[in-house]
Each structure stands twice: as structure tokens, then as C-alpha cells.
Amino acid sequence: MKKIFGSLLLFMSLNSGSFAQGTVPELIAEGIKLHDKAMYADAIELYQKALQIDKRSARANYEIASSYFAMKDYINALKYTDIVIALNVDYIDQAYLLKGSIQDVTGQPLEALKTYAKALQKYPNNQLLYYNLALTSFNLKQYKDAENALQHSLKIDQLHASSHFLLALTMLTQEKRAQGILALYNFLLLEPNSKRTPSALKTLEEEMAKGVQDKTSKSGAATVSGNKDDDDFYTAEIMLGVLASSKQNESNKNKTAMQLFAEHTNYFFTILGEMKKNKKGFFWNFYVDYFYTIAQKNHTEALCYYIVQSKDDTYNKWLETNLPKMEAFSEWYTKYLHKF
């Protein structure tokens, strides 16, 4: 009996030691759980144990860098991202992303741009590298570079809401209003009810409502805002100004603000679609074709009500009597992709 009991204790001791040691994947998995609970120091301790087993584990080194970054210990975070990059095995593109972020938050945005550019030479299909490059470029007021990077980002992942949102801000900052509005519509279609939605929706409504400036020209006539450098889209911006002014027309007096919003949106999409003809370029192919098709398929009303759902119960009330319209739009939306 004593032999059996002793053997059992020995087995339990060995088994307990094996469990405490763990394999590299097990230690990393447990470390990630701790990281997700914001227990970063404890997570790093487990990752370090994994490195004691396999010091060349790219995953363990990357997770250590990630936890140090979360702790705002940027020196150590950078140290371990460089280890991952030097190992040149796995998680290299993620390490470049993290390294660029570290450089950005530590006041080295130009170095971050170099890091992203270097990474994109090796990983030209990494969407997040393009997005981070765009974000840093935007913050440096390098708007053309941001615009170019965001176009690449959306060609890889057209459902990346943040790229649509940042592209909208980039275009509006450059006074390219029509392009910015199109990107805002797409963002709101993807994120109709998030923390960013209210500001995006407010911006969209403001951009759709303006067009004729408050100031007047020397002749006393109202002037139309917009960027004349892009004549094609500038024409569409003039039409937006006309639409904004038409709200006071006798024929529109009994219409709700939501009805006018849907009508003006549909007109905007239609005008751009009819203007396109043989025009080429990212915005014409990616956005104009997409939203013109929505107008042609009679889905604009559904889109407009869907994207305002964060404001109040307007969408839910509309849905009560228009469910078939929303279902038809939803079916179309799941099948139709952007072109570029």
C-alpha cells in the first residue's frame, strides 16, 4: 500500500512539474489570456518561460513586445520587435506594424513612415501596413500620401471601416468634398452604430447641407464652395449646393428632413453615376459605381434610414412598414462588391 501511495505521489509530482513547465504554445496561450485581462507583467513572465524553452520563438518574442507596448514600456517593446524582425521566421509583418506604432507614439513619425515603407516592400498585401502608413501621413499633413495609402488599403479590404473614415477626413481636409462624402456614406454603411458614428453622421449631414457659402461675391451673388482643381467632382458639389437651397422650395415644404436626405442622396448618387461615362480613377470606379448601382436598384432609401439608426428611433419606425425594402437591400449588399 505504501509503495502504491508513494508511486502515486511521484506521478502527481512529475505531472505537476510538467504542467507548471508547459509547452511553448501552452505558455503563450496562457500569457495571452493574462494580457487580455491587462495583467501584462504576469503575461510577460509566462512568455519569458516560453523563451527559456525556445529562445528563437518568434511568437513569444512578439507577445512580449506587445505586452510591453501595452504597459507603455516602449524601450523594451522596441527591443523585442527588433528581435522578431531579426529572427526572420514568423510574425515579421506584425512586428513591423508594432515597431511603426512605437515610433509614432514616441514622437518619431518620420521613422515610422520608413518602417512601414520597408515592411511594405516585403509584405505588399498587408492591409494594416497601408492603413498605419496613411494614419501617420495624415497626422503629418501629408494628405496625398495618406490618400494613396488608403486606396491601397481598401483595394485589399473594402470592408475596413477605419480606412473609409480616414479617407473621408483626408479628402474633406483637401476640400475634395464629393469624394469625402462618398467615403463617409461607405463608413456609415459599415458602422451605423458605433462610437465613431455620431461624429461621422454629423459631418455627412453638414457636408450635404452646405454648398452655397454664407459670404457673397463682390457682385453680391452667393458663391459655391468647392475645389475647382477637380472639375468633374466640382460639378457634383455645385449640384449639392443647389439641392441644399431647394429645401426651401414650395414642393419640399411638407417633406420631413429624412425624406429630403434620402432624395438628395439618391440624386447625388445618380448625378455622379451619369457623369462617370468613361472616367476612370479610384473614386469613380470604387465609390461612384457602387453608389450609382444602389440608386439604380432603388436601395438608396434603405441605405439612408439604415445609416441614421444611431440618432433616434427613425430607422426602427421606418423598418416597421418597410422591412421588404431593407431585406432587398441587405440581400444586394451581401453579394455586390466594389470595383477598382
Identify the role of each PLM range.
Residues D36-K37, A70-M71, V105-T106, N139-L140, ...:
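Register position in tetratricopeptide repeats
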Residues K55, V89-D90, P124, Q158, ...:
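Short coil turns that delineate tetratricopeptide repeat
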Residues I75, V105-L110, Q179-I181, N193, ...:
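Alpha-helical linker/edge segments of TPR/alpha-solenoid repeat scaffolds
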Residues P25, R59, D93-Q94, L128, ...:
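Start-of-helix register in tetratricopeptide repeats
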Residues G22-K49, I53, S66, A70:
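Alpha-helical segment of the N-proximal tetratricopeptide repeat
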Residues E63-S66, L97-L98, N132, L166, ...:
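Canonical tetratricopeptide repeat
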